Amino acid sequence: FVITSDMGLCGGYNANVYRMIQDEFSAQDHVVMVGVRGAAWISKRNYNVENVLSDLDEDDVYNALSKCMQDALDLFEKKEISKIQILYTHYKNTLTFVPTLETVLPVSKPQEEKKSGMHADMIFEPDKETMLQNMIPMVTKSILYSRYLESKTSEQASRRMAMESATDNAEELQDNLELAYNRV
């Protein structure tokens, strides 16, 4: 999954994502593009685009993303794809957002924690495997939606900064032109 913007005027937001696509993806990788700008960009390149989600209705975003994630999970379960990754823009603060590639599946094994003196045997009902089969789709869909929202936050912050910079430049140009006019 690659999450880009639906609108322009957001500075280098999309360019940073495109650069990471070129660095991290090959032509054989299955790609799901989320966002109008990314779909337009990738259509001119040699990538294996499985699906394009653009101009998503705000009320139906989760359902659309959920359906795509379920399709990816089905491919993963059939071993047609080896991993599911999300390329999104991680929001740190208003000025900092970083393109990030996160592997959702397969899940990496957590590092062993030191054993404490207490150990409790857990009884799972239903059994662990059934619980995992039910939880994995729920968790992966939630992760995708969360990354989508984080990317949208980054997009808006980037757009705000670009517009603020454009306004500052326009005011500076106006001041310079006013000075030049008054000298004449």
Summary of predicted features, one role per range:
Residues F1-V184:
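C-terminal beta-strand-loop-alpha-helix "lid" module of Rossmann-like NAD(P)-dependent dehydrogenases
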